[in-house]
Design a protein with these regions (language model features):
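Hydrophobic, well-ordered secondary-structure elements that form the walls
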Residues: 116, 130, 169
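Catalytic cores of secreted or luminal carbohydrate-active enzymes
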Residues: 158-193
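Short linear interaction motif-like sites in intrinsically disordered regions of transcription factors
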Residues: 39, 89, 151-154, 164, ...
């Protein structure tokens, strides 16, 4: 009711979508019902923001490349940053040249981007996730004012396929209203019933 705040919008930092989608991506059992709920959930009048990665935690590339955090460079004996990342390294910790590992990681990244960009609500991407940015397994780069914490824009050239995939998903979302309805989907065709 304060006139100074009349145009102010408050956002809630919720990790429900993030945690459920991460667990689904890595193959945890019993996630389908929760995934289906969060894919169609609009969040009521206040709306909802959906993300799988954010400024606190792994980048999308690191989410599929590391099972555990690697925050040694932060000077806190790897005690800082979240311990539970719901990540899976796809068979090798950190960077890999194995074709099967790289192919699986690329597929998992595309799956994650698909979930975020085509779920109901407002999609949010961590800067650099659209082209494979990495923080080398550091999930708490608050003190890394160096290449570890910076977005490496060279990835835009070296990971063009991922960038194009993101653009295609954005095009789909903008073009087809089924990806941004005014009302929450309920799992049945109301018009045809």
């Amino acid at each position: 009711s304060d006139p100074a705040l009349k145009d102010t919008k408050l956002l809630v930092h919720r990790t429900d979508f993030q945690d459920i989608m991460r667990r689904f991506l890595k193959g945890d059992e019993g996630m389908i019902e929760a995934v289906m709920y969060w894919l169609r959930h609009l969040g009521g009048e206040e709306g909802i923001f959906n993300y799988i990665t954010s400024h606190t935690g792994f980048t999308l590339n690191d989410l599929v490349s590391y099972d555990g955090k690697h925050n040694e460079a932060n000077g806190e004996n790897n005690q800082d940053g979240p311990d539970y990342n719901y990540s899976w390294n796809c068979g090798a910790e950190g960077p890999s040249r194995k074709k099967a590992v790289c192919a699986l990681r690329n597929r998992q990244i595309k799956n994650a981007l698909f979930l975020v960009l085509l779920a109901q609500g407002t999609p949010c991407l961590l800067a650099g996730d659209e082209f494979g940015n990495s923080q080398r397994g550091n999930n708490n780069v608050y003190c890394q004012d160096n290449p570890t914490g910076w977005v490496n824009w060279r990835g835009l050239k070296s990971n063009r396929e991922q960038w194009e995939f993101v653009k295609e998903l954005i095009y789909l979302r903008k073009t087809y209203c089924v990806f941004h309805p005014k009302e929450e989907m309920n799992g049945m065709d109301k018009v045809g019933c």
